[in-house]
Amino acid sequence: MTKPIFLNAVLQEKIWGGIKLHTLFNFTLPSDKTGEAWIISAHPNGISTIKSPAEFAGLGLDELYKTHPKLFNEQQLASFPLLIKLLDASDDLSIQVHPDDEYALEHEGEYGKNECWYVVQAEPGAKIVYGHTAMTPEEFAEKIDNEAWSDLFTEVPVKAGDFFDVPSGTIHAIGGGIVILETQQNSDTTYRVYDYNRTDDAGNPRPLHIQQTKDVTTIPHSVPTTNQQVVTTDTGTRTTFVENKFFTVWKYDINGDYSDALSSTYHLVTVLDGKGTLTVDGTQYPIQKADSFILPSGTPTLQINGSVQLIVSQSNQ
């Protein structure tokens, strides 16, 4: 019998964090500087545990992935390929870049990080850093060395409902006043190029990674081509945000009794808003805002009755 796998989130404190992961999603926060909820994660820095079904309760997602491959399309990857987060940027994040797989495996011993963002909430005037102005590696290095930050970084205004594809090599930062859902490769490698001269709890400057940034940044900046596809029925809308070699990400806006055929692989689901009933293999499961679960491989349809907004993803590796 196929059952959905519900997970417990791991909360992460950050210098730029706040309290919106509680006010929006009712998570219990470790402090008022909580920046991230790792809601579907098998990364060693924050492993989600299984809430249900009972036979898996308490297991880490990393262990479940290794010991029950049939749930995950018989995948034999070394580790669970994706990581899903909610981020509350009460303050600006450091301006940063992530390496690709080749560079990260050679220098960090883990995979690179391609990611994408769905903007859940944004205060008026909120912005992200997305890209840079340099046309050559020499110009890029010169502007960094001269700390010509305002000339180098490109700011983009954002609003709730926006989506951004952020491949490895992309200079980026989430600005203060923004809450996002992030779908990413299962990696925690970040290279900071600028951090507003902030210090850690001990008063020490947070480390920067200038040479690594110069090594891995895409020059000139390249905006990925996105061809969002929207399919609407009487009871719901499915929006395909991105489909690449790492993942596919969809948004579902459901209002009623809705069903959509799924591919044979497993799917990662987060409820961003609303509540309803999920039906899997004839059994009904209540779902509500902030729930995250995995539909195991072989689940034929996404079948939901209610009024909910979901972000759904699958690994393409």
Q: For each of these PLM feature ranges, what is it?
A:
Residues 1-135, 195-224, 249, 317:
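Transition-metal
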Residues 79, 87-92, 101, 122-125, ...:
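Ligand-binding loop in jelly-roll beta-barrel domains
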Residues 84-85, 93, 109, 115-118, ...:
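His/acidic/aromatic-lined binding-pocket segments of jelly-roll/cupin-type domains
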Residues 119-140, 238-240, 254-265:
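Short beta-strand/loop turn elements enriched in aromatics
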Residues 142-150, 273-277:
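Short, structured beta-strand/loop micro-motifs enriched in basic residues and often containing a Trp
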Residues 146-152, 163-165, 171-222:
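An exposed, glycine/acidic-rich loop-and-rim segment of catalytic or binding clefts
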Residues 152-165, 179, 281-299:
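Short acidic-glycine-tyrosine-enriched beta hairpin
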Residues 228-291:
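Acidic/His-leaning functional-site neighborhoods
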